[in-house]
Amino acid sequence: DSVASRGLGDVYKRQLEEPLLYLYGDADSGKSSMLRGVVHEITRLYGPTEAKIFVVDYRRALLGEIPQDYLGAYLTSHEMTEGGMSELAQFFQSRIPGSDVTPDQLRSRSWWKGAEGFVLIDDYDLVSTSQGNPVAVLAPLLAQAADLGLHVILTRRTGGASRAAYDPIIQRMTDLGATGILLSGNPEEGQLIGKVKAIPAIPGRAQIVSRDRGLVAAQLLWVPPSYQ
């Protein structure tokens, strides 16, 4: 695989062109910074009527980062996430094209109107546990996410990530060839995205694995919290 350096803007712009992204990284490796960068890019490219952001963030690391007029929901517990994701799944199911939708409508996505929906999940390992996974209701929608205006971006710690391969959301993303990012992590976790292992690295140093570009190295710029 070819390895090249890429900047922050290209990484985020490309992600918003794709519906699915997952990221693994240790503590202080740049996971929440990446999500803040995604939020900045969403608000740069879309107006508040064109994009709504739904945050699942049990540690509240992104609290105050999403402008109020873009915020669809901020979910900080299992119970809140269960209700919020169930409602969101029902909403996006209503956008699934029926048999009367023409090929031209499919190409232009003109059979529905409304905002793009961005689901940002920080510390996914706190969300998908042995007690259940309230985000799993989105799994059946991921194959059609681009057609439905649904985007799912999640981060997870590297520890135990090899077990996450069997998680319904991550497994579906993997099956669909979603782009994955590895920040700093322990290589003893094994192959996490394709055949790529995590490596110890400075914050923001990323290995980006995509179906069409293979393995690309990038340094994600630090996006500071807005309250600092």
Language-model-detected regions and their locations in the chain:
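The conserved Walker
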Residues: A27
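Phosphate-binding P-loop
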Residues: K13-E18
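Conserved ATP-driven motor cores of ASCE-family P-loop NTPases powering translocation/secretion/packaging/pilus
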Residues: F92, L142-Q144, L148, I153-Y227
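Hydrophobic anchor at the beta1->P-loop junction of P-loop NTPases
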Residues: L23
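Single conserved hydrophobic/aromatic residue that forms the stacking wall/gate
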Residues: D1-Y12
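Alpha-helical scaffold elements adjacent to nucleotide-binding pockets in ATP/GTP-utilizing enzyme cores
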Residues: G37-V38, G84-E87, V137-L141, I169-L176
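Mechanochemical coupling/switch segment within NTP-driven translocation systems
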Residues: S33-L35, E41-V135, T158, G185-E188
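Conserved glycine(s) of the Walker
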Residues: G30
